[in-house]
Amino acid sequence: MIVGCGDVGMRCAAQLRARRENLRILALTSRRSRCVELRAAGVVPVVGDLDARATLKRIARVAPVVLHLAPPQATGDVDRRTQALVAALASPRRPSRQLAPAYGRLRAWRTAARSARPPFQTSAIVPDALPRPVVVYASTSGVYGDCGGARVDETRAVRPANPRARRRVSAERQLRRATARGALSARIVRIPGIYAANRLPLARLEKGTPALVEADDVYTNHIHADDLASILLRAAVRGKPARVVHASDDTELKMGDYFERVARAFGLRSPPRIARAEAERQLEPMLLSFMRESRRLANARMKRELRIALRYPSVDDFLRTVSAPRPLK
C-alpha cells in the first residue's frame, strides 16, 4: 500500500506493475477525485485521511508492505499524520471484506514477488511474519540541519533546524519506537532534492531568481525520481529494521552550480549571483531555508546494503538525455 501516492508513489506503482501485472497495489488517498486516475494506473484506491483517524480503520492489516510517502502536516513539531498511520497499522481490527484479499491471497503475492525481475528482486516484499507490516518511510536529509559542507553518513546525529525538519525527526522516532515494540518493521530512507523532467527549476531560471555567489553557496544533494522509486522498493526487500539509508546519487554540486547545469542544458540564462546578505533581503523564506544548510550525503550504505545501481548516477547523466535546448531569452 502506498500512502501519499503522488509523483514518486505513482513511479513506484508503475515499476511494480511493469514486472508483475497481477500484483495488487493499494493507495491511500484523501481525495475521491483521484480514484479514477489511480485505477487507470492499476492501483486500487482506498479513501482515507491521515488528518482524520476515524477514516483509517479499513487499512489495519490490509497490506504486508506500506510505502509511507506522505509529508507531515504544516504546523507543530510532532508529525500527527505518522501517529495516525502507526495507530491504524498496529490496530488489531480486521480489514473489511472488500480489502481482505491483499492478505487473503498471500500465496499469489509470494508467487508474483518471486518471479519479479531485477532490479526489483521482490521475493521479500511479502514478509513471512504477517501481519506485522514492513513500512518504508520517505524522510528527508533536512533532519541533519547545516553541516558546513561536511560529508555526512547515516550515523550522524540529527540536528533539525526548522519545524519542517523537526516533524520529520518526529516521524522517524515514532516509527522506530513502533518497530521496537513489534507493531511494525520500519525502514527509513532520507531523501535529498528530487529531480526529473517534470521536477526541474526551469520556472525559477526563466524568472531569473538569483543564486548565491560561490563563496556563500551551499552543497546540495540530488536523486532522480525514478531512482528514488527503485530505492524505496528495494528498501522494502533488503532494508533492515529501523535502519536509515540515504537515497542520494553521486553528484557533488553547490546549489548555484546545479542551477547553471540545468540552465545550460535547456538553453536558458544562468542565474545571477548575489551575496548571502542580499539574498536574505530578496528571496522568500522557503528558498532561504535551503540556502542555510550545506552537506554532502554519503551513499555507500545504499549501494552496499540495498545493492542499488542508479540509472542516473549524477545530475549530468540525466541532463545529457534531455531534449534540444531552448533558445536563450
Regions found by a protein language model. Name each.
Residues 231-287:
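Mid/C-terminal beta-alpha module of Rossmann-like enzyme folds, strongest
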Residues 30-88, 99, 107, 111-114:
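NAD(P)H-binding glycine-rich loop region in Rossmannoid oxidoreductase-like domains
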Residues 169, 181-182, 194-207, 234-245, ...:
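Glycine/proline-rich active-site loop of Rossmann-fold NAD(P)-dependent oxidoreductases
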Residues 86-99, 103-110, 114, 119-163:
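Conserved Rossmann-fold NAD(P)-dependent oxidoreductase catalytic core, especially the SDR/UDP-sugar
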Residues 203-223, 227:
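A conserved pocket-lining segment of Rossmann-fold NAD(P)-dependent short-chain dehydrogenase/reductase
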Residues 313-329:
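Amphipathic terminal alpha-helices
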Residues 148-188:
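Catalytic helix-loop patch of NAD(P)-dependent Rossmann-fold dehydrogenases
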Residues 260, 280-309:
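Conserved C-terminal active-site "lid" loop/helix of NAD(P)H-dependent oxidoreductases
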